[in-house]
Amino acid sequence: MPGVETIKSSWADEVELDYGGLPPTTETVENGQKYVTEYKYNKDDKKTKVVRTYKISKQVVPKTVAKRRTWTKFGESKNDKPGPNSQTTMVSEEIFMQFLNSKEDEKANDPLLDPTKNIAKCRICNGEHWSVNCPYKGTAMDTNMMEKKASAAAAAAVDAPKSGKYVPPFLKDSQKGALGMRGRDDTAAIRISNLSESMTEADLEELVKKIGPQSKMYLARDKNTGLCKGFAYVHFKQRKDAAAAIEILNGHGYDHLILSVEWSKPQNN
C-alpha cells in the first residue's frame, strides 16, 4: 500500500486556521536583546510576519524624564506597555537645544555699560565726575580754569575772521555802525537758558562777572510768581568776552542743570 504523503502547510496557513485573523504582537527578551514579533498584511493582502530586534541598554536620565515615562497612557494606547509603541511612535534622532538670551549678549557688547569706562568728565579738574559735583567748584582751581578758558575763547574770537570760517553779518565789525542806528548793540549780547526758578540777579552776576565786564543784564521773571522764567540776557562791553562766556558756560552744570548759552538774536524794528 503506497504511503500517504504528508503535505506540510505554511505557518501563515496555520495561523489563519488557528486564529482566523492577525495574532497579537509578542515580545521576548534573551541575552540582553528584545525580540518583537508582529503580523500584518502586505500590499498583496497577504499575512506577513515581522520580527524586530532591539538591543537593551541602560542609561542615566534626568529625574523629570524618568518620571514622565511612568505617566499613565490614555486613548488608544492606554493598554500599551511602558515605552514607545512602534506602531504609534517613531523615535527620531535626539536633538539638543541651547537657549541663548540675545539681550544679555547685547548688554555684554555695549561699550556704554563697560564698568571700566566713565562717560563723565569734570570741566574743572578733569576728574571722572560731573562738574556740578566737583569738590573744587568755586575754589581757586575753578577760577583759574575759567580764566584760561576765557583767554582761549577770546583769542579764538579774535582770530576767527582770519580762519576763513563763516561769520554772521550781525557779528562782523563792519556792522557796528548799522547796529548803532538801532539804539542797542547786540553783538556782545548772549542768551543764557535752562536756568532754575530760584535764579536771582545776584546769582547771574556771580556767574558771569569773572569772564568780563558787563554793560547790562536782564533776568526774565514771571509777572505773577516772580520766579525766574528760565532764561536771561547778558550784554558784555566787548564781543570777545561774550564769545568767551559762550565757550565757558555752554554745557556748564549750574544748580543741578546744564546751561545752554548762545548769541542773542537781534531784534527787528
From Swiss-Prot:
The keyword Cytoplasm applies. It comes from the Eukaryota. The keyword RNA-binding applies. SMART domains: RRM. Its main location: cytoplasm. One of its GO terms (cellular component) is eukaryotic translation initiation factor 3 complex. Residues 188-266 form the RRM domain. It is found in: Cytoplasm. Keywords: Cytoplasm, Initiation factor, Protein biosynthesis, RNA-binding. GO terms for molecular function: RNA binding; translation initiation factor activity. It holds the Pfam family RRM_1. GO terms for biological process: formation of cytoplasmic translation initiation complex. InterPro entries: eIF3_g, eIF3g_N, eIF3G_RRM, Nucleotide-bd_a/b_plait_sf, RBD_domain_sf, RRM_dom. RNA-binding component of the eukaryotic translation initiation factor 3 (eIF-3) complex, which is involved in protein synthesis of a specialized repertoire of mRNAs and, together with other initiation factors, stimulates binding of mRNA and methionyl-tRNAi to the 40S ribosome. The eIF-3 complex specifically targets and initiates translation of a subset of mRNAs involved in cell proliferation. This subunit can bind 18S rRNA. PANTHER family: EUKARYOTIC TRANSLATION INITIATION FACTOR 3 SUBUNIT G. Component of the eukaryotic translation initiation factor 3 (eIF-3) complex. The eIF-3 complex interacts with pix. Belongs to the eIF-3 subunit G family. This is Eukaryotic translation initiation factor 3 subunit G-1. It comes from Drosophila sechellia.
